[in-house]
Amino acid sequence: MKSFFVVALLVAAAAAAPANPDADAVIVRYDADQGDPQHYSYSVETSNGIAFSEEGALKNVGSENEANSVRGSYAYVGPDGVTYSVVYIADENGFQPQGAHLPVAA
């Protein structure tokens, strides 16, 4: 009889567990442009507050210094309810993110 109550309590606890709101997230906007072989851009937004956009281009085409240059941003709502945003550049100098919540290099 005790085991029945323990099992019943476990089942009730599992049924009462909060659902993951991100599990039901859907893409609400998607845009992409890849028509030019030396340039691309795309952006995505989801129903749970995630947003991402990026554009990239090949610079110094045909030269010894040819390199990819990428600019983008992303944002998401953290578990604390705060929206975190990051803007970044990625090029021959590496990945360079900036955001209010990120430390600044000296």
UniProtKB/Swiss-Prot annotation:
Domain of life per record: Eukaryota
Keyword Phosphoprotein: no
GO cellular component: chitin-based extracellular matrix
Signal peptide extent: 1-16
TM segment ranges: none
Keyword terms, alphabetized: Cuticle, Signal
Location of the Chitin-binding type R&R domain: 37-106
GO MF, one annotated term: structural constituent of chitin-based larval cuticle
PANTHER family (UniProt xref): ADULT CUTICLE PROTEIN 65AA-RELATED, CUTICLE PROTEIN
Function: Component of the cuticle of tobacco hornworm.
Protein name: Cuticle protein CP14.6
